[in-house]
Amino acid sequence: MTVSSDTTAEISLGWSIQDWIDFHKSSSSQASLRLLESLLDSQNVAPVDNAWISLISKENLLHQFQILKSRENKETLPLYGVPIAVKDNIDVRGLPTTAACPSFAYEPSKDSKVVELLRNAGAIIVGKTNLDQFATGLVGTRSPYGKTPCAFSKEHVSGGSSAGSASVVARGIVPIALGTDTAGSGRVPAALNNLIGLKPTKGVFSCQGVVPACKSLDCVSIFALNLSDAERCFRIMCQPDPDNDEYSRPYVSNPLKKFSSNVTIAIPKNIPWYGETKNPVLFSNAVENLSRTGANVIEIDFEPLLELARCLYEGTWVAERYQAIQSFLDSKPPKESLDPTVISIIEGAKKYSAVDCFSFEYKRQGILQKVRRLLESVDVLCVPTCPLNPTMQQVADEPVLVNSRQGTWTNFVNLADLAALAVPAGFRDDGLPNGITLIGKKFTDYALLELANRYFQNIFPNGSRTYGTFTSSSVKPANDQLVGPDYDPSTSIKLAVVGAHLKGLPLHWQLEKVNATYLCTTKTSKAYQLFALPKNGPVLKPGLRRVQDSNGSQIELEVYSVPKELFGAFISMVPEPLGIGSVELESGEWIKSFICEESGYKAKGTVDITKYGGFRAYFEMLKKKESQKKKLFDTVLIANRGEIAVRIIKTLKKLGIRSVAVYSDPDKYSQHVTDADVSVPLHGTTAAQTYLDMNKIIDAAKQTNAQAIIPGYGFLSENADFSDACTSAGITFVGPSGDIIRGLGLKHSARQIAQKAGVPLVPGSLLITSVEEAKKVAAELEYPVMVKSTAGGGGIGLQKVDSEEDIEHIFETVKHQGETFFGDAGVFLERFIENARHVEVQLMGDGFGKAIALGERDCSLQRRNQKVIEETPAPNLPEKTRLALRKAAESLGSLLNYKCAGTVEFIYDEKKDEFYFLEVNTRLQVEHPITEMVTGLDLVEWMIRIAANDAPDFDSTKVEVNGVSMEARLYAENPLKNFRPSPGLLVDVKFPDWARVDTWVKKGTNISPEYDPTLAKIIVHGKDRDDAISKLNQALEETKVYGCITNIDYLKSIITSDFFAKAKVSTNILNSYQYEPTAIEITLPGAHTSIQDYPGRVGYWRIGVPPSGPMDAYSFRLANRIVGNDYRTPAIEVTLTGPSIVFHCETVIAITGGTALCTLDGQEIPQHKPVEVKRGSTLSIGKLTSGCRAYLGIRGGIDVPKYLGSYSTFTLGNVGGYNGRVLKLGDVLFLPSNEENKSVECLPQNIPQSLIPQISETKEWRIGVTCGPHGSPDFFKPESIEEFFSEKWKVHYNSNRFGVRLIGPKPKWARSNGGEGGMHPSNTHDYVYSLGAINFTGDEPVIITCDGPSLGGFVCQAVVPEAELWKVGQVKPGDSIQFVPLSYESSRSLKESQDVAIKSLDGTKLRRLDSVSILPSFETPILAQMEKVNELSPKVVYRQAGDRYVLVEYGDNEMNFNISYRIECLISLVKKNKTIGIVEMSQGVRSVLIEFDGYKVTQKELLKVLVAYETEIQFDENWKITSNIIRLPMAFEDSKTLACVQRYQETIRSSAPWLPNNVDFIANVNGISRNEVYDMLYSARFMVLGLGDVFLGSPCAVPLDPRHRFLGSKYNPSRTYTERGAVGIGGMYMCIYAANSPGGYQLVGRTIPIWDKLCLAASSEVPWLMNPFDQVEFYPVSEEDLDKMTEDCDNGVYKVNIEKSVFDHQEYLRWINANKDSITAFQEGQLGERAEEFAKLIQNANSELKESVTVKPDEEEDFPEGAEIVYSEYSGRFWKSIASVGDVIEAGQGLLIIEAMKAEMIISAPKSGKIIKICHGNGDMVDSGDIVAVIETLA
């Protein structure tokens, strides 16, 4: 619908809410405003309409409309542009509240809560309506503003007290009006005006801002023309408000949606009509039509309810009315302004005493007991809304009596805590309407609306119901349609669950994952059986089967609603043989549910559990049965770490056994430590010092009273001496005896035992003691042979030897490994069987001669004899052979009286169908989970039970293998670097939650090089092998581990290989497997090479998190566009000198930006073009000859995790990109696989020459800037601004991604100092900088770039706009810059042309900086200004701060908490309104930086909105705000803090007033002692005013006590390094450094880290600790304690002391006033001579600095020219050198060995030459990229 300029409000008369919304959506903003203005004009005409008390002004309407228009989501708002009226006892800001009493009138400072909610929903308030004075009456005639007549008759009353609201809705002026209802005022007017009157459940609408009538009973009510509008407003207004309304309460979470079809409705047995004859007819007809809905209508005696009703006016509740206006009445208001009837009623309260009050309350409670009994079997009450349609004259004749009769059926409702809905009953024969009221129990509001709808369909058939006065029109069917409570069947699917998905059971999390809503618990129809299916995994599954009624039962189930869009995700988690079908409920309704395939309930082991009536009862029976089992052990110690320790603890918890973990120093924070009930430190680092130290383990068991020790696998699990030691100590070893371990654990003796058992053996030797003997035996066996450590395991201590030349080295290596890892150097040899498969049998023995095989596993896929992927059952294995294998294992176990778990390993020759004994592992195997998955057994539980001599009966145990299970081992190793160990800190970890994942790692886990590299075992179960392969592939695709390199890509390549699909496996197949990684490798890192994305990390500038991203975004975007990537795809930024990169996969690349020699395999390649790269090619990007940065785009991007929404690297914060750092030598970057690559957008394309950035060849640049935020004449003199643009600025050598420093003319300041902001004229109170701001740090400008700080205290003269920032990214030290002024419009034009040109690759669309764009002169940065209104509404200055920012500055240059609060109010308003175009609000001390999206809102449009918002912000000095009190430990002047100061003195500035000690400086300039500085720090409470003061959530905080605000100064120049956690004082401000960063505050101590990078702490939802208005306190701790706390913080276990609180400004002002004398004295002491001395001190220091700055550079070691630096490619422990300083070596010759994760890695010489330095000694830790040696190359 559209409207012309001459349209009047008449067209909108009678519109519903939806009509209004449809109009606004289909009309222009101008048309919408015109119609609203027309409506307002139509009410401002003579004669005066008594329904209104006040109407808004045109200005107010425009203001409301402007704010509505600014909202981004306005068209989705439920009341978008809908005009509403409000009863004049409800506060509306901008209109007086009178309560119909002129002398009572006041101007509210804010909206009532309900009005606020309606405005938030898009409503426009048009006026306040008339009422019975002080809402006392049901007639609508008790008002000095006139009597409001019925909408149908001027002679009849409208009903009260909400008369005006009913009138304006009935006449269609507005579709909705608010009333209030204490005793019927929201219902009686509805009946008399043909309306819907909704009186909600008491307390669900806030009464904040409502003039009370009876506060304990008051309800805000809704008048509407239709049910839909009433429900819509109910949903909006139904919000708890406990902070502002004492009677507020939340709505129930699952309210009744509808009454049953045979709902029981009670009507009064006796109805007094007081002589009325027409209304009984209407009521009787209404009741009859209710019956036709199927309702069961009964008559009851309403006397208890009527007795309750009489209490309202005959009891002490009238005293509430008196209390509400007592102070007003005491002020002796003019009598003529008071309604005599109302006042006489209210003053009747004076006769009651406090005793009477309690007496009547007791009486009410007694009556309520009768009412509860009366309503026990009743769902709904139906009563006449009011018995009469009184005339004005009748009311005048009997004002109290008529009023009293009208409340007959309304007065009791709120006293009884009931909900009510008044609805029309039709018209009398005299044309007047009346109605009925449906009354339900509390929280039945939705059901009452639905019942009313049913009633309407009967009483007004075929859509014949009229509304209000519109008797010739009918309500549209859509306008009586209801949504109901939040569960919406149109967007959800009802699902019945019957098994492990029930509440509290193991799979309930799956329902939570898909956001399912619980609806009810019910039963099936009598046609079902329930089965418990065979358990083939950790979770017991049910099978629901439909049968004939005579054979079936009712089964209990729970019903949920699942969002349709997530239903597929839920189905994907349903395991076979279950599926989704339908089930019939006892109500007859059919809904979705689980069904079971016939194979499920017919499978062996299926149990019919129908008799239990439901799965939960059966589950509880099993739990009870389980708990009655024999008690095994009270406490068990796990002598292990990692995933196996975690897995064992799960079983111990299930069995109710107390678990004890032991841990090394590196494992202090590991999961097994936190999961266990008790944890004991072993105090050591290496395995030998900890997990292999038998004495420590046994001591820990004794210390914790552990009765048993379970060793897992590895470490001491197969150590016979340990088993014996446990036995000697009286501790049960969960495993076989020492003798058995000794016999089987040593592989040579195990062969002898197997031989006795008749098991076929591979030809081999006994133990060999020398290399010579090894050579002899190997020759006899014939090569190839296997060299094996007799004590080895897990792939460690066995290697293949192909020829005699290798035997010596490998023999010594295996011997060393056996001794190092297993404490046994014994070695023997076996013949190597070509193409053998490794098949093993899981064995359990009871220790008394019985043994049982639990199936076999194929573990043939091995690399370096380390298993990679295992599966069960073994594929391609004849059943006869399978049984023979199992039988051989059982025989061996029985022969030995084997106890607990063991694995008998065989070599299987598939070609010959023969197997040979390999060895017995006398422990639990790594791959045991796949056996558990197919058998449903818990092998750890079996071990525990067997160890406790409570073994299962093997004779009766039937082990059935169901389906296929596979396991892939995820290792921290680099498959591109020969699987070298890859330790590191895991920054992101995601595993599929539908698969079984046995792991010990999570985000934040530190992978140590000390131990096995296993991260996780990913286990799946399928119905067959193909299904298992598919699931394992899916699980691997969903697995994401970042922070260290893993073998995940390698595993995926194997799983998807042809040989694996066909099960063509052998133990050596991976030796020849051609793994083709999807990765690139850094072989030379370049000067500063990092991963970035565009637009970077948006939305966290206010926190101090810079966006990072590319310095030259234009070139970066071109690179992605050329290769066909989405613009957000991560790519590589190169600075000055580029990297060399080996591509291990085929792809397409593009290099853009600065010019450099780029070669591919030595051949030069072009820039700015797509280039195809072959697998194995090497890309080299040389030194940039023009520009500073180049960009490498790779098709599909790079697989790195997002951090705070971006892939970009922020090196100072150590976040984003690749491990939060620049790329180093040896880094391997994986590229997304085809399955997960969503970055590719189009095909690669060439770009036109005209799009290539024009990088200066002359080193001279012209860069456009916008003026401001700070300019002339308030900060700079005009000539200084002119000079800024006329002079050329040289780029300083100290320029980088944090900022580009400039050298040029000294600014001419317009002021002598920065006032409160600081001593220098460049200083100001901390505010948030714009990206690209030219920031004057003193007299030296620096351009804030993408990694720069956000919050600071220096003025900014100009800002480089977004389109020109690319140039800043390309300037080099020594280049010169000429700045030119641009307007906002020109800046936006440049930006938009860039965007269009890049997207279209059309060079003609690109606009470059030219003379047309440049302003003739600089402009004022002040865009607008609002003058001061009062102290709480100060002057506001809107400053231009670039082309995407506006800086809003409040008041004078002083810190003021009221200003801070005003800023907070503005931020909250923008957030609430979701204001169009605003990206982020960043708070400073007295300003807020607003970032906006120029595509959504222009600068001018934004200014209009911001100005409008200012008038919305109203508060007084008594404001309160949520504030956390954060108490932090601080070590005063700890060594690390003092080291920062010393480093500064040694490297930056040797002398300054604050040197050598910062605390002494603070004490001296303030004339106090060091102790007083100390006392201040630990007694002050600091208020946080902003974040990012340096970086990453660092607070800018001020002491609340003015006496703690000392004189002071920041460092000049700043420090280049500040320790993380350092606490600084800068004048009146305090800062905590969140990262190792530059800084300038005076350092006083150190606290814990305040940036939780990975959100590891349980309380961390975001990385930053503080928010504005939080309060910080410090308490003293020692440095030693602080270091411990810091370590705990870094591992997420430290709990910060945070107290939830409220900062009460009124209370604070009282405290200030109570201490004003001492505060004044302190402040005066800082002025005068002291201030002058301080200023002079700083001035002299700055002068000295200019004259001479002593900078001592860091010492650098001098190596000969051409020396070759050798870097480590991995992290580990330096084991030993294999060459010495002075040795002459050849290229490729080994230099040294690094030991990491049980592997020895040789670092070889890259070139020939003489070793001149080895940088490490034995035992040193070495990080990847560290220098390890230096070689002097020889000619």
From Swiss-Prot:
The modification Phosphoserine is found at residue 803. Its EC number is 6.3.4.6, 3.5.1.54. GO terms for molecular function: allophanate hydrolase activity; ATP binding; metal ion binding; urea carboxylase activity. ATP binds at residues 122-129, 747, 830, 865. Residues 751-948 form the ATP-grasp domain. It comes from the Eukaryota. GO terms for biological process: allantoin catabolic process; urea catabolic process. Hydrolysis of urea to ammonia and CO(2). This is Urea amidolyase.
